[in-house]
Amino acid sequence: KKFYLRRENAMIIDNVYIYTPDKKFVKGGIILKGEQIQAVYEAKDTPKFEEEVFDGNGAYAIPGLIDLHFHGCKGDDFCDGTKEAIGRIAEYEASIGVTAIAPATMTLPVEELEHILEVAAEYKKENTDKRRADLLGINMEGPFISPAKKGAQDERNIIPCNVEICERFLKASDGLVKFIGIAPEESEEAIDFIKSVKGKVNVSLAHTNADYKTAKAAFEAGANHAVHLYNAMPPFSHRAPGVV
């Protein structure tokens, strides 16, 4: 199937369902130039092209997804601490429509986490492979969490939130750490911690047993995210809403 319209060096993908800003799928096509979407069109307005047209066979076309919390895939874990593992993770994610990632760490010893973060920073600087999802950031799930809600995290490595250690993480990652989880009830210094680092990293409530009052104070201090809401936190009830 061919259409004809002078549009130099463009790629046209026709016969797809495009996810639009009004949250609807509309049948049409996409015109790409270089790495950018130049235009989209509805099927009823299909122009004529002189370039080759690729038939999308009725596939759904959506913006690239961003995964902010996962630990690995296809046998590789972000905490393997190798550039090769990160590369394989990023390539697989891109193959399923995820174009940017912020993989999560586990609760490990501080020095081990620093090494993992350093490796990620090196990978970020060196990677040029367009087939891979962009390493947008890192989501630190611990070590500043609650033993009572540790889940699969290793309790031996759990410590209270600490500004100096957080700064070490930020330095090791060259600023790539974008989220850091804390259990605010585990330290009297939690509010000061949040106020100290909130301009450098997003503070999450994660693996926490905080009650409503403690969680509210943390959010008012600058925390802005909750990790896997409802999971690894107190159950929601009308008398004790907790973090939720």
Question: What spans do the regions from the language model cover?
Answer:
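Charged helix-capping and loop-helix junction motifs
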Residues: 82-85, 116-119, 162-163, 239-244
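N-terminal metal-binding scaffold of metallo-dependent hydrolase/deaminase domains
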Residues: 4-47
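Divalent metal-dependent hydrolysis catalytic cores, especially in the metallo-beta-lactamase
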Residues: 71, 87-116, 132-146, 173-185, ...
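Active-site core of metal-dependent hydrolases
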Residues: 171-244
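Active-site mouth loops of central-metabolism enzymes
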Residues: 72-83, 152-159, 202-206
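Generic structural signal for well-ordered alpha-helices
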Residues: 90, 114-121, 166-170, 194, ...
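Conserved phosphate-binding/catalytic loop of the ribokinase/pfkB sugar-kinase fold
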Residues: 146-171
